[in-house]
């Protein structure tokens, strides 16, 4: 599934989901810091659990996901790139 944030006929951001896994979240560079990422994350928080992978060095993204209630569950080396990455998860407060 893909959720798109569009305004004035212009796609400004989108989030791609594979069941409860966030495959990607992108906000156009000129539209960052305007709450678009928050709105997209809020849309998929209907799910009980969400997970994603993010590079450890992408400190802006890590901080964004932490602010949205995600926590680091695991740290690993990504096989193809050799980069350190985090598995981050979000649990709905209403579930165990």
PLM regions and their residue ranges:
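A short, internal acetyl-CoA/4′-phosphopantetheine-binding micro-motif in the GNAT/acyltransferase core
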Residues: 22-32, 54-55
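Terminal substrate-recognition subdomain of acyl/acetyltransferases
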Residues: 86-96
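Conserved acetyl-CoA pyrophosphate-binding loop and the N-cap/start of the following alpha-helix
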Residues: 31, 35-43
């Amino acid at each position: 599934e893909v959720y798109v944030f569009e305004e004035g006929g212009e796609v400004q951001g989108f989030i791609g989901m594979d069941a409860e896994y966030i495959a990607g979240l992108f906000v156009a560079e000129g539209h960052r810091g305007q709450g678009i990422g928050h709105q997209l994350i809020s849309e998929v928080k209907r799910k009980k659990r969400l997970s994603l992978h993010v590079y450890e060095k992408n400190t802006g993204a890590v901080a964004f996901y932490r602010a949205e209630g995600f926590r680091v569950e695991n740290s690993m080396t990504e096989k193809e790139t050799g980069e350190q990455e985090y598995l981050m998860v979000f649990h709905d407060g209403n579930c165990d």
